[in-house]
Amino acid sequence: MMRPVVVKEKRVNESQIHVVEDEVRQAKTMDRDIVTHAMKQSIAKLNPKVMIKNPIMFVVEIGFIITFILSFLPSSSSSIPGWFNITVSLILLFTVLFANFAEALAEGRGKAQADSLKQSKKDVFANVVKENGDIVQVSATDLRKGDVVIVKQGEMIPSDGEVIKGLASVDESAITGESAPVIKEAGGDFCSVTGGTMVVSDEITIVITSNPGESFIDKMISLVEGAARQKTPNEIALNTVLTSLTLIFLIVVVTLPIFTNYLGFQIDTAVLVALLVCLIPTTIGGLLSAIGIAGMDRVTKFNVLAMSGKAVEAAGDINTIILDKTGTITFGNRMAHTLLPVGNETIEQVGKWAAISSVLDETPEGRSVIEYVQAKSISYNRELAEQGEFVPFKAETRMSGVDLRDGTKVRKGAVSSVIEWVQSQGGTIPKDVNQKADFISKEGGTPLVVAVNDHIYGLIYLKDTVKPGMRERFEQLRQMGIKTVMCTGDNPLTAATIAKEAGVDEFVAECKPEDKIAVIKAEQDKGKLVAMTGDGTNDAPALAQADVGLAMNSGTTAAKEAANMIDLDSNPTKIIEVVGIGKQLLMTRGALTTFSIANDVAKYFAIIPAMFTLAIPQMEALNIMKLTSPLSAILSALLFNAVIIPLLIPLAMKGIAYKPMSSNALLGRNLLIYGLGGVIVPFIGIKVIDIIVGLFI
């Protein structure tokens, strides 16, 4: 006998359901508000002063005005009924409105994001420390660069700044959307704080780094809602080409009556206007601004703040990506794995001095050394180290350690740096130092040499692991024709092992901050565009030199000011996704341009026979779609020309499907889909519309 299966029902908290329902309801309301606002804006944008910024749609608007006026005048042609002019004018009006709606809808999404950011700019007060030590409470709007402010637990950080004293957990969810608080402390690369975020534990003293209107949130708001959006160079170039095409077709249409008069017949003005509108690239002309705005919007939704559309476009053209090993390719949590003594030294001696060099070292590596030594029960004098003077790690020296009171100098660091330091003090180098360092490097680890004055005791084996999926991601970049270069402070053997495991194309070992600039310039000298990530002040020059510099929001103010993109999630690997978004923007613009121009082929076969068949009967052979009548053919072509714009708005906003592949493969794929599709779709669309229109004519 089978036992009945008892299914336990998982109970969900009703309050959680209500929260989710409220969020969904708010999202729907926001979308509805954006659409309603876009509809109003599409009418407001009919102002000729606004329309002239888009020459293609401005020509369509002029066509609407001409045909609208003609609809109230006697027809010059007996073959054109009175309702034709008003019908053409209405179709042209809706063509312009659809184009305006596409742009307004894209702008509306940006303004919605700006409104949510403005909510985080509450009227807060700051505890300012005066020069005499007194604490005065002032409004955040009165703060100026250089003011020193104390922020306690539960208080809002009043403006952008850098921590100069203390350590605290900060809730940055208002900016990044990430609920987990982050640690901010004085010194290092994680001292930068953003106005509008909240201290959730402890207390910090910060120095203000921005004046009112110049804060990070202010910049975000102005970028996403700025009405005067600067067009990118590629957008300007494409707009110039499309405007030139429009001008050429305008000249053709204006001179056409001279040709027809010679043949002994006249073409009605409304028909000429219809011909012009169908010939010029109205589809891409109506969607061009929306594509650019939507591209910026996609980057922002990815929690990346782009300082300009140019930066997003540049990301799409990137040829080389410079990546830090630690934190980007690997997890960056290098932990002490084992100790290797050299010469006649013992593991206890290596552990003792390794621990002493790490007592004051608050880095994850330093802490891991202490934990390893304690786990192995190796004794060391902690008090001796605490009384000494800490020597912090620097990118230039690539060593850290402590100077004890009795004059003893203890160091741990990169092999070549410590060897050079020992030799400078007259010490000799044990023969097996390099041998054991090579062994660690070949294993993919990082060797740190431990030395006291002029004597080397041994090595610390630090082990790091490559993030899963990195090899596949780099392979995708390779398929796109993008070269990856890994920069690391590790020695060449360690760098080579990690590079091989991760699958990067090239690596630069023992890399210092100034070396990154040299790598970037070398690539740029070859005519390539370069992207890189960084978070420290020492990364700022390289971020400024790169064509796309992605700074981490957790990094220093100098790094964020030098970069042209800021990752609010502080995830260095996101540079790969940013490149993908940039490429998607360029591909969407190119694909819809191809589709728009290819559309003209079908329109030729609709309008040309309709215009000339009565005078030149042989033209009937071009009526391959077998359209009902000349008037139906013209109206069907115009209607398709208008309707295709709103149908393509979702594609313009979302972007075309993007798959990593070579430029030639992408070109072939898009020509097939949007080139051939741009020819076939209008034939089908115009014929269907003609059948419907034919029922009413």
Curated annotation (Swiss-Prot):
Origin superkingdom: Bacteria
Protein's membrane topology: Multi-pass membrane protein
Keyword annotations: ATP-binding, Cell membrane, Ion transport, Magnesium, Membrane, Metal-binding, Nucleotide-binding, Phosphoprotein, Potassium, Potassium transport, Translocase, Transmembrane, Transmembrane helix, Transport
Compartmental location: Cell membrane
InterPro entries: ATPase_P-typ_cyto_dom_N, ATPase_P-typ_P_site, ATPase_P-typ_TM_dom_sf, ATPase_P-typ_transduc_dom_A_sf, HAD-like_sf, HAD_sf, P-type_ATPase_bsu_IA, P_typ_ATPase
One term of GO molecular function: magnesium ion binding
Keyword Nucleotidyltransferase: no
Enzyme Commission code: 7.2.2.6
Transmembrane residue ranges: 55-75, 79-99, 245-265, 271-291, 605-625, 633-653, 677-697
EC category: translocase
Residues that, per the record, bind Mg(2+): D535, D539
Active site: D324
One GO cellular component term noted in the UniProt record for this chain: plasma membrane
Binding residues for ATP: D361, E365, F393, K394, A395, E396, T397, R398, M399, S400, K412
Catalytic activity: K(+)(out) + ATP + H2O = K(+)(in) + ADP + phosphate + H(+)
Database matches in Gene3D superfamilies: Calcium-transporting ATPase, cytoplasmic domain N (3.40.1110.10), Calcium-transporting ATPase, cytoplasmic transduction domain A (2.70.150.10), HAD superfamily/HAD-like (3.40.50.1000)
One Pfam family matching this protein: E1-E2_ATPase
Quaternary structure annotation from Swiss-Prot or TrEMBL: The system is composed of three essential subunits: KdpA, KdpB and KdpC.
Protein task: Part of the high-affinity ATP-driven potassium transport (or Kdp) system, which catalyzes the hydrolysis of ATP coupled with the electrogenic transport of potassium into the cytoplasm. This subunit is responsible for energy coupling to the transport system and for the release of the potassium ions to the cytoplasm.
Family: Belongs to the cation transport ATPase (P-type) (TC 3.A.3) family. Type IA subfamily.
The protein's name in its UniProt record: Potassium-transporting ATPase ATP-binding subunit
Organism: Bacillus cereus (strain ZK / E33L)
